[in-house]
Swiss-Prot record:
Lineage: Bacteria, Pseudomonadati, Pseudomonadota, Gammaproteobacteria, Moraxellales
Binding locations of substrate: N265, G322, I323, V324
The organism's place on the tree of life at top rank: Bacteria
InterPro entries (UniProt xref): ATP-grasp (IPR011761), ATP-grasp_succ-CoA_synth-type (IPR013650), ATP_grasp_subdomain_1 (IPR013815), Succ-CoA_synthase_bsu_CS (IPR017866), SUCC_ACL_C (IPR005811), Succ_CoA_ligase-like_bsu (IPR005809), Succinyl-CoA_synth-like (IPR016102)
Organism: Psychrobacter arcticus (strain DSM 17307 / VKM B-2377 / 273-4)
Name of this protein: Succinate--CoA ligase [ADP-forming] subunit beta
Family from the record: Belongs to the succinate/malate CoA ligase beta subunit family.
Length: 388
């Protein structure tokens, strides 16, 4: 689950991190009032959406008067902001953050933390190249990114934070400031089940103070049951409606931009299915894992969710029967097709537990389903059917 910038900053502030202060505004009038309370002559209007690249997309603007703050806010609210991290539809702007102006600054730094699955540890990343996409830095100048892995038994140690501070070129009182900041960031990361934390830029102001100008936090959704205060921060308007509906039925669904819907059991098989669709010239419209213990009701709902996507021109159902029986899947497919007005070709590949029985049930159903033998055959048939 992603947090908005203002939510991420407030969380970091509660752990002692210095942040760029600001107020939320849901209208132009509220933005004008917030501008009056800003301690600086210039304010920054920031569209609050779950996506990076807002500045280049026109979602971050400087304003010098309350009238300008009102105008910019009215122009942003109610629109969809399209950035390099969103799809073509963009993300809805429902409110803005009216923040104090932190510039000019001495330098912009980057500080981030992730769960490194290879080392199974929290890993911090820091760079002197703040204010730009870290992906670009990693690609063009990877030597400018410093990494430090944290031993979960002892946590972040002061010497590790000091080492990062030295590499970032900090000096004097800035060293102790950074150690406190990084220690607080680590504490926030662990205590709130964060899986991604980014402070970009982390600015060194002209007075030498270090401050978090922006903040991005992603929470492990599997941990929300024990984080009620964090869960209450969820903004469903920023999430795909089909993904939200899928979550209600314990379905792992991720919307993509293709035209071939996929229903698969098992994350690995789902990834392989999308890969082979791409290999044969198609474009998957989604990732959907119905799970190893899929029930008939869940399969029916999965089919409905796939077909709710207007861009879907065909569906590939790829099931390997292990825990889940292929005959049950077949019955669920029939029930779903009868319940939903299916106007697109459907290719079905069943293997494993009761696969022959499942195939027989589908064949005797009288429905216009395309049977496939093997993964390659299934991919070729759905791509051909969509192109026909």
């Amino acid at each position: 689950m992603n947090l908005h910038e203002y939510q991420a900053k407030e969380l970091l502030k509660s752990y002692g991190l210095p942040i760029q202060e600001g107020l939320i505004a849901y209208s132009g009038d509220e933005a004008a009032a917030a501008f009056d309370k800003t301690p600086t002559d210039i304010a920054v209007i920031k569209a609050q959406v779950h996506a990076g690249g807002r500045g280049k997309a026109g979602g971050v603007k400087l304003v010098k008067t309350r009238e300008e703050a009102k105008q910019v806010t009215d122009e942003l609210i109610g629109t969809n902001l399209v950035t390099y991290q969103t799809d073509a539809a963009g993300q809805p702007v429902n409110f803005v953050l009216v923040a104090e102006d932190m510039y000019p600054v001495q330098t912009e730094l980057y500080l981030g933390a992730v769960v490194d699955r290879s080392s199974r540890r929290v890993t911090f990343m820091a760079s002197t190249e703040g204010g730009v996409e870290i992906e670009k830095v990693a690609e063009e100048t990877p030597e400018k990114i410093f990494k430090v892995s944290i031993d979960p038994l002892v946590g972040l140690l002061p010497f590790q934070a000091r080492e990062v501070a030295f590499k970032l070129g900090l000096e004097g009182k800035q060293i102790s400031q950074f150690v406190k900041l990084m220690t607080g960031a680590y504490q926030a990361f662990v205590e709130n089940d964060i899986d991604l934390l980014e402070i970009n830029p982390l600015a060194v102001r002209e007075n030498g103070e270090i401050v978090c100008v922006d903040g991005k936090i992603s929470i492990d959704s599997n941990a929300l049951y024990r984080l009620p205060k964090i869960a209450a921060l969820q903004d469903k308007s920023q999430e795909n409606e089909r993904e939200l509906k899928a979550a209600e039925f314990d379905l792992n669904y991720v919307a993509l931009e293709g035209n071939i819907g996929c229903m698969v059991n098992g994350a690995g098989l789902a990834m392989a299915t999308m890969d082979i669709i791409k290999l044969y010239g198609g474009k998957p419209a989604n990732f959907l894992d119905v799970g190893g213990g899929a029930t008939k009701d869940r399969v029916v709902e999965a089919f409905k969710i796939i077909l709710e996507d207007s861009s879907v021109e065909g569906v590939l159902i790829n099931i390997f029967g292990g825990i889940v029986r292929c005959d049950m899947i077949a019955e669920a497919i029939i029930a779903a097709i009868k319940e939903v007005d299916v106007k697109v070709p459907v290719v079905v590949r069943l293997e494993g537990n009761n696969a022959e029985l499942g195939a027989k049930i589908l064949e005797e159903s009288g429905l216009k389903l395309i049977s496939a033998q093997g993964l390659s055959d299934a991919a070729q048939k759905i791509v051909d059917a969509v192109k026909a």
